[in-house]
Amino acid sequence: MQSRLAWSKGNWTGLVGSLISLTSSSTSHALVGNNSILICGKIKIILNIEMVDTGRIFVITGPSGVGKSSLVRCLIDHFKDKLRYSISATTRKMRNSETEGVDYFFKDKAEFEKLIAADAFVEWAMYNDNYYGTLKSQAEQIIHNGGNLVLEIEYQGALQVKQKYPNDVVLIFIKPPSMEELLVRLKKRNDEDAITIQNRLKQAEKECQQIGHFKYVVTNNEFDKTLAELQAILLAEFN
């Protein structure tokens, strides 16, 4: 995946320029369609270059309960022709409202660790005693076909993706208005016990300390306003 993202037309032109500098001063260069032509004295070199139009990776993260999933679903619906979602894998228990292969690929710990050993993930992380990861098979297919990819992942995974693909990733952090409001939202889900909710709040405080790594930080106070702000961010990045 990295080579496809890195080798754009500009990169190839730079490579050709480097080749020219190593040849005689009589060398000339022309770029015709996908063919780069070097003329070194009487020698003509034609490089047939396949230009791959790859998309961008939008990584959306934030504490559990902040509203990431709902926002991402609305973004995908709004940008039907421009944005694709990569379904993550996890070892956490499936919620009543979730569907296998739609919300997540649900794995047991042994299955997930086999995938880690097989280098099957773009990124993976342990969060609240469960594994989460983005499958390469999902992500690479979308990006290689020129699609823009949106990932809804934990902040550790977000930083891994940025490190691997620094020029192609846009990091967006969704922040709660306050920890008190986040607690209210977590309780409203009514699918976790009090200890789990408290653990999520502690984790949320740690995550909010990482916002300096993100290009955009959006506070989800009112859903419609937050969605409009995210739509504006993506439109600007598409262009």
UniProtKB/Swiss-Prot annotation:
<dbReference type="GO" id="GO:0005524">
    <property type="term" value="F:ATP binding"/>
</dbReference>
<dbReference type="InterPro" id="IPR008145">
    <property type="entry name" value="GK/Ca_channel_bsu"/>
</dbReference>
<keyword id="KW-0418">Kinase</keyword>
<dbReference type="InterPro" id="IPR020590">
    <property type="entry name" value="Guanylate_kinase_CS"/>
</dbReference>
<dbReference type="InterPro" id="IPR027417">
    <property type="entry name" value="P-loop_NTPase"/>
</dbReference>
<keyword id="KW-0963">Cytoplasm</keyword>
<comment type="function">
    <text>Essential for recycling GMP and indirectly, cGMP.</text>
</comment>
<dbReference type="InterPro" id="IPR017665">
    <property type="entry name" value="Guanylate_kinase"/>
</dbReference>
<feature type="binding site">
    <location>
        <begin position="62"/>
        <end position="69"/>
    </location>
    <ligand>
        <name>ATP</name>
    </ligand>
</feature>
<dbReference type="GO" id="GO:0004385">
    <property type="term" value="F:guanylate kinase activity"/>
</dbReference>
<comment type="similarity">
    <text>Belongs to the guanylate kinase family.</text>
</comment>
<keyword id="KW-0808">Transferase</keyword>
<dbReference type="InterPro" id="IPR008144">
    <property type="entry name" value="Guanylate_kin-like_dom"/>
</dbReference>
<dbReference type="Pfam" id="PF00625">
    <property type="entry name" value="Guanylate_kin"/>
</dbReference>
<keyword id="KW-0067">ATP-binding</keyword>
<keyword id="KW-0547">Nucleotide-binding</keyword>
<protein>
    <recommendedName>
        <fullName>Guanylate kinase</fullName>
        <ecNumber>2.7.4.8</ecNumber>
    </recommendedName>
</protein>
<dbReference type="GO" id="GO:0005829">
    <property type="term" value="C:cytosol"/>
</dbReference>
<feature type="domain" description="Guanylate kinase-like">
    <location>
        <begin position="55"/>
        <end position="235"/>
    </location>
</feature>
